Amino acid sequence: MTEEYIIDTSIWVDIYEDRKGYNDEPLGDYAFKLLVKIKAKESFIVLTDFLIKELETIYSVEEINGMFKSFEKIIKKVIATEKQREEAKKIAKERDVPAGDALHAIVARDNGLILVTRDGHFRKLEDISKHYKPEELI
């Protein structure tokens, strides 16, 4: 079965801005290497409508399209259901995490996706979906 990955917003920002970590770790490099590996394995990257909306608060449509261009043949789009959105709102309130993070964990769970993030909020969502940092998967 082909693996499918959901890449959190922070990882796309790491790539686009070639960000470094607190100890000068090459976060952008780790993330890019993972995407190259996903492409080489002919696995898929899943984009959600919510991810696109988050990126649009930071970047122009042209910049976002540029981010995805090299990977367009392995991209699948998923639109979160109303039921998933309602569950995310409930979990976000109960666990004090952003609703978008809860939504990505739920979408990952419901679609059998590998969730890639370095956002600490996902530690509170481990029972919904396990998550990995890019460097753990390359």
Which residues does each PLM region occupy?
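Acidic, PIN/NYN-like endoribonuclease modules and their adjacent C-terminal/linker elements
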Residues: M1-T2, A105, R109-I138
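Short, well-structured N-terminal submotif of metal-dependent ribonuclease cores
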Residues: M1-V46, I58-E63, I138
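Histidine- and aromatic-rich ligand-binding microenvironments
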Residues: I7-D8, V46-T48, V97-P98, D119, ...
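A generic structural signal for short hydrophobic patches within well-formed alpha-helices
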Residues: W12, I52, F122-R123
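Short, flexible helix/strand-to-coil boundary loops that buttress conserved ligand/catalytic motifs
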Residues: Y16-E17, Y59, A92, E126-S129
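A short, hydrophobic/aromatic-rich structural module that often spans a beta strand
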Residues: L51-Q84
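Phosphate- and divalent-cation-binding pockets in alpha/beta enzyme and binding domains
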Residues: E54-L55, E87, K124-L125
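Active-site neighborhoods of divalent-metal-dependent phosphate/nucleic-acid chemistry enzymes
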Residues: K76-I114, R118
